UniProtKB/Swiss-Prot annotation:
The keyword DNA-binding applies. GO terms for molecular function: DNA-binding transcription factor activity, RNA polymerase II-specific; RNA polymerase II cis-regulatory region sequence-specific DNA binding. Gene3D superfamilies: Homeodomain-like (1.10.10.60). It comes from Encephalitozoon cuniculi (strain GB-M1) (Microsporidian parasite). GO terms for biological process: cell differentiation. Keywords: DNA-binding, Homeobox, Nucleus. Residues 82-101 are annotated as: Disordered. GO terms for cellular component: nucleus. The gene is HD-4. This is Homeobox protein HD-4. It is found in: Nucleus.
């Protein structure tokens, strides 16, 4: 069983990060193009494995915690869905069979808890090396 104090500390930390990022102009997308960091791609990919269509709240939380604009998050998910569909079509055409590809169950508008997003960020393999 998880220590409730650790959960409360994680929520408090996520809240402080959200407050800080809300005051940044970079959150509003006023800066130029920036490449996504490894940790941003890692977290976005893990969320994409859970749901290809995250809810508005999930996109907002990701944007704040990853220091990206909500629109950038939305575009990333659109592009990832497109790549995923292309890979599925390519796989079906390689099989050369007229069989119908099994449809994946799509979970739409799933809200991923902030605790899980924070845990993903903190559990990133080289998180301990960030800032060194």
């Amino acid at each position: 069983m998880k220590d409730p104090r650790w959960i409360m500390e994680g929520e408090a930390m996520a809240g402080l990060v959200k407050l800080r990022r809300l005051s940044d102009k970079s959150y509003l997308g006023l800066s130029g193009y920036r490449y996504k960091t490894h940790i941003q791609v890692y977290v976005l990919t893990k969320i994409f494995e859970i749901t290809q269509y995250p809810s508005h709240d999930t996109r907002q939380n990701l944007a704040i915690l990853l220091n990206m604009s909500p629109r950038t998050i939305q575009i990333w998910f659109q592009n990832s869905r497109s790549v995923s569909r292309g890979a599925a079509k390519k796989k079906v055409s390689k099989d050369n069979g007229p069989q119908e590809a099994p449809k994946a169950k799509i979970v739409s508008n799933l809200t991923v808890p902030v605790k899980y997003i924070t845990w993903l960020i903190l559990s990133y393999p080289s998180y301990s090396q960030i800032g060194n």
